[in-house]
């Protein structure tokens, strides 16, 4: 068996094109373009790359894009004050604070200070709670992007045994909620899980998000399984690989996401979708 490739790059471009078309319709109807504020504190090289890709994506679809590049010496109080101003700014529909933040700034306090109605990353407890209660509004970007990939490829998930490897607030936990909504029987594994191999060998749908290159051996994959690899790891050679041994896994799975070009592009595309949704919610008087 040779797995079919789930091409996130192509689907992400489709999503961007769809959003760009909807923005043009808004402008033609006399409405304003959605606005996204991207806040970067410090000079983390990886964060700078991520932020530049998000800003570029915004501009490509016709959003108002505002950048706030703050020095590493910025205090927590100063950052919270900026977020307060952006919460009150009628031109801004989405606020994105790039993580990680410098030492001395409480990530949780900062993320919870963002208005849930402008939380386009989907990290605010209100939005995570809505997802848990089967009434999602702004959904965490990577899990929602994965669901979009499964939907676009018409992969039926109802009744599947799904296993999520990794229990982070950004991917693992909200992903488990998305899979429940998608009709899966869902297991979340983590660093205290015993018999990890046994769980994976029983998985019809496997989502791996641990940030360790080749963490899941390919021969653990159940024949015919759907494999979603969220990991993005750069080796010393410069090669970028995922958390799953792709070469062997792709001979056993029915569908698999490559790294790069799988889940990664969908995270930014979903951020764009969420920003448009936040703008439309604002138009319609829908508040968090």
UniProtKB/Swiss-Prot annotation:
UniProt KW Transcription keyword: no
Organism name: Erwinia tasmaniensis (strain DSM 17950 / CFBP 7177 / CIP 109463 / NCPPB 4357 / Et1/99)
PANTHER family cross-referenced by the UniProt entry: C-1-TETRAHYDROFOLATE SYNTHASE, CYTOPLASMIC, C-1-TETRAHYDROFOLATE SYNTHASE, CYTOPLASMIC-RELATED
Gene Ontology CC, one term: cytosol
Pfam family membership, one: THF_DHG_CYH
Domain of life: Bacteria
Keywords attached to this entry: Amino-acid biosynthesis, Histidine biosynthesis, Hydrolase, Methionine biosynthesis, Multifunctional enzyme, NADP, One-carbon metabolism, Oxidoreductase, Purine biosynthesis
Subunit structure: Homodimer.
Protein name: Bifunctional protein FolD
Catalytic reaction list: (6R)-5,10-methylene-5,6,7,8-tetrahydrofolate + NADP(+) = (6R)-5,10-methenyltetrahydrofolate + NADPH; (6R)-5,10-methenyltetrahydrofolate + H2O = (6R)-10-formyltetrahydrofolate + H(+)
Family: Belongs to the tetrahydrofolate dehydrogenase/cyclohydrolase family.
EC number per UniProt: 1.5.1.5, 3.5.4.9
Biological process per Gene Ontology, one example term: purine nucleotide biosynthetic process
GO molecular function, a single term: methenyltetrahydrofolate cyclohydrolase activity
Function: Catalyzes the oxidation of 5,10-methylenetetrahydrofolate to 5,10-methenyltetrahydrofolate and then the hydrolysis of 5,10-methenyltetrahydrofolate to 10-formyltetrahydrofolate.
Gene3D superfamilies to which the protein is assigned, alphabetical: Leucine Dehydrogenase, chain A, domain 1 (3.40.50.10860), NAD(P)-binding Rossmann-like Domain (3.40.50.720)
InterPro entries on file: Aminoacid_DH-like_N_sf, NAD(P)-bd_dom_sf, THF_DH/CycHdrlase, THF_DH/CycHdrlase_cat_dom, THF_DH/CycHdrlase_CS, THF_DH/CycHdrlase_NAD-bd_dom
Binding-site residues for NADP(+), renumbered to this chain: 166-168, 232
Pathway(s) it belongs to: One-carbon metabolism; tetrahydrofolate interconversion
């Amino acid at each position: 068996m040779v797995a079919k490739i789930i091409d996130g790059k192509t689907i992400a471009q489709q999503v961007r094109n769809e959003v760009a078309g909807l923005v043009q319709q808004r402008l033609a109807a006399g409405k304003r373009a959605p606005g996204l504020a991207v806040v970067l504190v410090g000079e983390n090289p990886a964060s700078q790359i991520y932020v530049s890709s998000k800003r570029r994506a915004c501009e490509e679809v016709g959003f108002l894009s505002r950048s706030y590049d703050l020095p590493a010496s910025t205090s927590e109080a100063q950052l919270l004050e900026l977020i307060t101003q952006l919460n009150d700014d009628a031109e801004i529909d989405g606020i994105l604070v790039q993580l990680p933040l410098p030492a001395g700034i409480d990530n949780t306090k900062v993320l919870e200070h963002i208005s849930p109605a402008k939380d386009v990353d989907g990290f605010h407890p209100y939005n995570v709670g809505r997802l848990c209660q089967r009434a999602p509004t702004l959904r965490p970007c990577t899990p929602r992007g994965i669901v979009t990939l499964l939907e676009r490829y018409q992969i039926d998930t109802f009744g599947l045994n799904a296993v999520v490897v990794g229990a982070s607030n950004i991917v693992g936990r909200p992903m488990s909620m998305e899979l429940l909504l998608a009709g899966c029987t869902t297991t979340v594994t983590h660093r205290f899980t015993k018999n990890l191999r046994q769980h994976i060998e029983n998985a019809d749908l496997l989502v791996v998000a641990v940030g360790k290159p080749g963490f899941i051996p390919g021969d653990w994959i159940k024949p015919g399984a759907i494999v979603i690899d969220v990991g993005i790891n750069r080796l010393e050679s410069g090669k970028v690989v995922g958390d799953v041994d792709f070469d062997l896994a792709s001979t056993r799975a029915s569908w698999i996401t490559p790294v790069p070009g799988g889940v990664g592009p969908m995270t930014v595309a979903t951020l764009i979708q969420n920003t448009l949704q936040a703008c439309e919610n604002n138009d319609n008087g829908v508040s968090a």
